[in-house]
Amino acid sequence: MTQYLPPNLLALFAAREPIPFMPPVDKLPHEKKSRGYLGVAKFMADFEDPKDTPLPKTVETRQERLERRRREKAEQVAYKLEREIALWDPTEIKNATEDPFRTLFIARINYDTSESKLRREFEFYGPIKKIVLIHDQESGKPKGYAFIEYEHERDMHAAYKHADGKKIDSKRVLVDVERARTVKGWLPRRLGGGLGGTRRGGNDVNIKHSGREDNERERERYRLEREREDREGPGRGGGSNGLDARPGRGFGAERRRSRSRERRDRERDRGRGAVASNGRSRSRSRERRKRRAGSRERYDEFDRRDRRDRERERDRDREREKKKKRSKSRERESSRERRERKRERRDRERGTGSGGDVKERKPDFRDMDVIKIKEEPVDDGYPTFDYQNATIKREIDDEDEEKYRPPPAHHNMFSVPPPPILGRGNASTNPNPDNGQQSSGDPSWWRQ
């Protein structure tokens, strides 16, 4: 088909010129002459000595970097803690109370509790000299603990014994003695010391009950709970170690030893400051015995009050249980049975209380098929009507009613006497025809 195309189109299908040949610059690979493979011994002198080779650079991984930062932070905290322990002196606190042996420590206070509320709650045990409610120095918010100084040491002991676990503003407080100035070597919790097991670690080691650490009953109950959780399994109890394996097991013994040391130190100080006079020593011993007797009486009074309160609570619980039982039994009964029983009891009481005369009760129209008619009050300006002696119109029964019967065919309709016309009188009573009325026998009188 292309041979029939015009020349201008045939030029489009013409072949291109071939590429011109150029001689190669180098010899071809098969034309070259090689000397074969040689060793590298002669090049060993060009390498450096292995002794002079630098050590490889190690790159720190992500885990190593996190561990390094954690270690550095722990070192800084330990250094700061050591420095604060060296500078800490509880005797130089500005807001501290005067006598530490008459000071009570109150913890776990509600943040909304005010100083006046604490005073009202703790003045029950004795007169209070000073209350120090601790606040944050930066934000000014309460920290949840306070110090209360009593005027007498026996009042402080009474509050220490009876106020522990008291609920103030819907929160149970913890009561303890001040230990910063009474126990040698004592440190607060922020410096690594302190007592209590609520912030030891996780849920498996923290103590959940509210109260002092030496509360043997609470500790025993908590230990039994931990053993029961361990028996149920680690999946439900949250740990396989019991209470005996936790750190800080001997806090109660340590606190008892610290109290005994406090007592010995106070007695030794009193012995040093005492005068050698026999009279003054006897008077002081007499005063001491009086104080002990007073504190003992105060303790006995508190114990009696506690027993009375517990008995009242038990009585109230019994009354509540009885009321619940009575209410349940009432709910089971139907309303009609209750109404009948009340009516019988009321009739019985009225019959026995008034010498046997039973008062007639009003009929209960709810149980009777009686229709009660409402009576209106009698008007003063109108006479009364006796309905009992009045004549009552009675309707005729259908059987006795006289049915309408049409007149016979021979009967003249005009023979029926018309009704009397007023003013004309009656023919039977006035037969005189001059009055304008015809006799009843004349049927055509009314047509005139």
From Swiss-Prot:
The keyword Nucleus applies. This is U1 small nuclear ribonucleoprotein 70 kDa. It comes from Drosophila melanogaster. Residues 102-180 form the RRM domain. Residues 206-234, 262-272, 294-320, 346-376 have a biased composition (Basic and acidic residues). PANTHER family: U1 SMALL NUCLEAR RIBONUCLEOPROTEIN 70 KD, U1 SMALL NUCLEAR RIBONUCLEOPROTEIN 70 KDA. InterPro entries: Nucleotide-bd_a/b_plait_sf, RBD_domain_sf, RRM_dom, snRNP70_RRM, U1_U11-U12_snRNP_70-35kDa, U1snRNP70_N. Disruption phenotype: Lethal during embryogenesis. RNAi-mediated knockdown in the germline results in defective nurse cell nuclei decondensation and dispersal ultimately affecting oogenesis. The gene is snRNP-U1-70K.
